Structure formats: structure tokens, C-alpha cells
């Protein structure tokens, strides 16, 4: 953002509005006109070295940014609120505004104030909005997280059948993806990508069926005119954007996909105004190509963020050993979208295995990778006119590192994925890389307007201009020496004043050498005669004077021209630069996962198309690292085998019982995380792992409510459980924890019981089901694929020791009172709880589970028959009658004691 000279504000003029006649300056009239075209954005109005905001924009911005709110002039009799931010710090303020959900229209001066004056004294400098800054269209380094993609997503929908598709684009890297979706998958597909901004047609935005999804997203949802999403116009829009005559090389897209592509491109053109970020060609993602993880599961497993929204404590943080921004983004992408093709998974695992087998070489690769800057984002900034010399320097630095990596890999026998990456690196534009090395100085300024970024010797005219600018005294002294030698006048001087500028001065006695001949007169032009001296100039000196006066401006002009030349060359090589950068990210992720595997003792999983799920000595990747950091006891590894018990059979279900604090939830989560890690192409925290590809992963772990939507914790649990039971199939993995705990005991037991039956008979999937309803363990007698396992504990001196070991069998207690004591409940409460528990256990009737088991046809309710009433014996009747006849309030202590002896005697006879 270049500094501009602020024009003098013209006098106010009459502006008769509908409310009342007011006097507005031409500048304020211009502001109001531009603001009227950008009502949904804060308007950054350029005035000299500041962006100023007025009216409601100023009030909102001053509050959001914590800057002073002042006033400037009046409108309709009221003071006009105003605030401003300096241009040089604009990115910092934009970052804060975007983070708070604002959109910003950047309005620049598009002509010099001197030009405006030529049109008249009251003319205002022309201004125009050059860009709309929105959450999904950021390119500035300060506004972006280097480890996180910044996706703009657009949703397309066709009339009639209502078919849906999604497009997501990161204009900071050029990534461009497209996929079809369905109404029931829409929310999950949006949250998998986690866009910064979602653009939808205004008709879809107000659709009653879709609106709940938009309300849930919690991101910036931007409705746009439906005409932008016209699938019929999409082909022309795509051809124009990519500057191609035909889309034959782009593949075939469905109508909803074309609608989404059209809306995304139209929005980019709208926000970037005259600039066109270079994008990759749209890449289609096919349904079923990645592991489906619904939003609730994604949140409960804390893949990219914890439940509180932090990156620390997430699985991504625990496994990230990347050293480049591109590598970090690729790792996050792989984690959030694991593969379902064993062949593709094996390609990634082969890369990690190779890196583990070539540790010395990989250490050298990682040293080179640490020097790789964010090339795609630097390229994007250059392409949209927001780049600087350091972005060109980033490309040069990246090329150098890529060259070093190519040299290290020369002759290496690489697995397929890494071999393809090496090939892309070797195809980087070597000529352009050499050009950058020749052109760019070693130390680069942040802004191109500062100059000094072109290497000395690259451009002779620039060197001359710099010499004139920086060494004018030496140049003048050199010319003076030339003239002394030419004329033989040793007292000749070149001097300067504000009237004549530069001139040659000689004494009157020595002036003959410059005036005696016609040749001398034409060479030395007389300027002024003094009492004792004469002054001359030459064509050469006059040109030099002009050059010196304009040297700084000319030097900067030459540098800016070179910058534009290099930028154009970079954009011309965009495809090969991005391909090389992507290849470097692949090497970064592969070596990082190898470092993780070596550091944490992970094993290579065997992934195939079977229904196997056999984890030996599995561990929770996040908890294990946390325990190591705390120097606590080592993590207790556990096996998990949900594989079919016979050939051709369905996956197994483990019913897990055990105490609170015993580690049930950790065990459930760790197996889900191991599946995700395996299918993203990572080694896993286990002794060994054989995993049949999971196509859908569902997890209902942990309790949370949704008060904003009027949902209790139990209601949220039931909604999520319903989604699992309605969608899980034989290749799915289901993790359920404490289903039914949020309601009355028998209600909860009934729901949990029926859910397990349904998973076993209808979904027929692999599942882990943790519960405190110990009656459910009886299900193993009738459900052939269900096994009981429990978390082992050891009781010692009225306390309980959690062993965190999973063993076959069933628990008969939950040790809740002991856990309450550990949590610090008052001793009186703990003691009373223990007494109540003993009384409840003593009065508990037996046989409930047996009655449920005997009633299996599936899903039927418990038989409504009552237990036969026991036959009352005569002696029992006599005792009962005696007790019934007692009036406790009328007995004296002596009578009460006698009565006790009598009742004891009757009881003995009975």
C-alpha cells in the first residue's frame, strides 16, 4: 500500500437531501457514494497516509480496534464520527477486524492530487474500492496462519432435484477442490474442510431445509445473488478465469458442481476487483474416497482442536513434526480426510518406511526443508499485486532448497510417492531460479517502494542512477577532473547554487581556454560573468544535473519495472512452482511422520479391505505424550480385537464395563485415533495393527449440551446416537460411551440395551460400547459377536487402584463412591453414600437381566408379566400381623423392649 499525498479538501457544497438541506464537502460526498455501494463492509477510505472511517463504520471500528473515536464535520446537523488507522499498519488492524467477523472494503486514491487540481480547484481526488477483504479471501502473510489452510467455500444447488455440491478454494495457495454432497452429509462435509467463509446463493440461504446447517456452522456465511451460481453460465465464467477456449482438459462436472464453481469464481472476482489469483484447475473428490467422520465425532476425538478450541492437546498437535508451512497444512489435510483405498494408503506408508530406513539422508533432507519458505502463498501475493521483494526472495530461497534436496536424492531408490515428488522438484523452473539469483540483492526490504532490492550489476542504468543518487559528489569531482585535464586550467571548479544549479567556474584570466575558439564556445556555454570569474556549463553537465535531480526517482522506477518483470515471470511459472512446493510438502510430511514413529515407537499398520480390527498393545497418542511430559507412570497399552470371529463373518462388538476413572473413554478413543492415523498414512501407536478399511467412523464419547438450540445433554446424546444407528454399515467403526446415562436408570438401560442389539443385528459393524449398566453383560449369552471386557482394578484397604488394563470379563461394580472420595467430596457425604449404596445393593432384586435375555426376539420390550406372589406361610402371617399392630408413637421404652423380644421369638418360630 503506497503512501500518497493527501489532497486539500475542497470547500463544502450544497447537497439537498431528502431530509434537509446540508452542506457536504465533495470529499464527504464521494465517501457517501462509495459507501452506498459497499453497505455490508467497513469502508477503509484512503486519505494520505491513513485509512479513515466515518459514521457507523467509525463507531464499529473504534470499538473493535480500541482506537480513538473523534469527529469531522457535520451531517444532517449531527457530528460525523470518525476514526483512522495508518496505512503502514493496516494489516494489523485488518487482522483484528476479520477475526471479529467484519468485512472491509479498501478504498484507495487512484490518481495523484496534482491531476485532480488540473480539473479545477474544487475537484476531489478519484478514489475507488480496489479490494474487499473477507475471511475467505486473505493473502497477506500477517493475516494467515502458516499451518492452516484458508478456504473459501461455495455451495451450489440445482433447481428441481435440489442436488448439492461444494467447492473450496484457498486463494493464498491456489488449491481448488470440488465434490458433490447430499443434505444429510452437507454439515459434515462443510466441517471436514473447515472453511473460513461459506458463500451461498441468497435463495439457498433462506431455504428452511438448509438454514439450520448454516446456523450450526459458526463461520462467516455470505449470501450472494443467485445469478452468480447459474450453472449454465459456469462454463463461460471458468473459461474466462482460466483464459482457455475449452474445458476439455478440466473433466466433466455435474450441474450442482458447475453451480458451486461459478459462485466461487464470481465471488473471488467480486472481492479481488481487478486482480485474478492464480488457481489450480478444479480437482474433484469422489464420494467414498475419504473416511467419513461426522462433526460430533470430529469434535469428540479432538482431531485438529480440543473441545475448547485449542490446538494444544489435539491429535494434530501431538503428531506434527513438520518444518514447513506447506507441510503442516498437508498433514492437517491428511488427518482430517483419511483415505479409504488400501493401495493409496500403502503408498503413503511406503514413504514413511523409506524415511525410517534412510535416517541419515532424511536428517539432511529436513535440514534443507527448514529453509523452505511458503512459496505458494508468496506466489499468490505476487499475482494479486500484494507481494513485495521478500516474496520474490521466498521463491528464490525455495528454489535453492529444492535444488539442494534434488541433489541429496540424486540416485536414491525412492518409493512411488516420493519418486513422483522428486520428479516435480526436478521440473522447477531452473532458468527463472537463476534469474532471481542474478536480480535480487542479498538483503531485501519489506516494501518494494523502499527500493534497494535489485542486485548491483544486474542493470547498468540502475547502477548509474544509484551512483548519481548516492555518489553525486564523487561523480561531479570526476567530471571536474576531466575538464581540468581538457582545458589545462588547474583552478577550474564545478560549483552549485539554487539559481544556476551546477556550473563551471574559472578565473577571468583563465577564461580564454573556453572562449577563444568557436569549438570551445560550443563546448562551454557561457552562463554568467562575475567581477573576477566567469561561469559556464556544458551539455554534459546539464544532463548530469538533470540526472542527479531525478536519480532517486529514476532508480526506484527502474527497480519497480524489474519487480514487475520478475513477478510476471513468476506467475507464468505458477504451475511448476506450485507443483514443486507441493512435492516439498510431501517430503516434509513423510520425514515428519518417520521422526514421529521413531521418537514414539510407532509401528507400520497393515491396512486392507477386510473387516479386521486387531490392535496389539495400542496406546493413546495424545495421552501417552502428555504422561511423558509430566514424567508420570508410563501409558498402559491394551489390545483390541474386533475382527470377525470366523471367515466371512461380521466385525465384533466389545461391551466394556469397569469403574469410573478406569480408562474406558481413553481406550475407546485411542482405537478410533489409531484407525484414523493408519488411514491417513501414518504409523500408529501400537505393537502391531491389522485394520480393515473403515469407511465411516462414529464416536459418541463425552457429554455436552446445546442450550442455544434448546437441547439437553441427553437430547444431544440421543440425536447423535440416532445418526450412528441410521448410518453405520459393516465397514464402519462405532465408538459409544455411556449411552443412556442422562435419564432414569431403567430408561437409560433400555435404550442402551436396544442400541447394542441394533448394532449387532442391523448395522453389523465393528463397535466398542462402554457402559455402567452391568446388566447388559448378559447380552453376550445371546449375541454371538458380542464379547464382555472390563477395566481391571485392585481394591486395597477400602481404596481402589486403577490398573488401566483391559481384560476379558465383566465388572460388577463401578466404584463411584471411591472415585467421589478421590475427587475430594466431604467425608460425611462419602460415608453416607457408602451406606446408601449398601442398602440399595442389599435390596436389589435379582433376575432382571435373565428376564431381558429370555425375551430376545430382537427389540421386544420386557415381558409385562408380574412375578408370582410368594405364598404367605401361617407363621409369616402371625409375624406380619404383630408388626402391623404396632403403634410406635404410643410405646414406652420398656414396652418397646418387650415387643422386640416378642417379635424375635415369633421370627425364630417362622
Swiss-Prot record:
Binding residues annotated for ATP, in chain numbering: 658-665
GO terms of molecular function: ATP binding; ATP-dependent DNA damage sensor activity; damaged DNA binding; mismatched DNA binding
Keyword flag Repeat: no
PROSITE patterns: DNA_MISMATCH_REPAIR_2 (PS00486)
Transmembrane segments: none
UniProt record, GO biological process: mismatch repair
Annotated Basic and acidic residues bias: 1-11
Listed GO CC annotations: cytosol
Region (Disordered) residue spans: 1-21
Keyword field: ATP-binding, DNA damage, DNA repair, DNA-binding, Nucleotide-binding
Gene3D superfamilies, alphabetized: 1.10.1420.10, 6.10.140.430, DNA repair protein MutS, domain I (3.40.1170.10), MutS, connector domain (3.30.420.110), P-loop containing nucleotide triphosphate hydrolases (3.40.50.300)
Disulphide bond pairs: none
Entry keyword DNA damage: yes
UniProt-listed SUPFAM superfamilies: DNA repair protein MutS, domain I, DNA repair protein MutS, domain II, DNA repair protein MutS, domain III, P-loop containing nucleoside triphosphate hydrolases
Family, per entry: Belongs to the DNA mismatch repair MutS family.
Role, per record: This protein is involved in the repair of mismatches in DNA. It is possible that it carries out the mismatch recognition step. This protein has a weak ATPase activity.
Protein name stated in the entry: DNA mismatch repair protein MutS
Organism: Brucella abortus (strain 2308)
Classification lineage: Bacteria, Pseudomonadati, Pseudomonadota, Alphaproteobacteria, Hyphomicrobiales
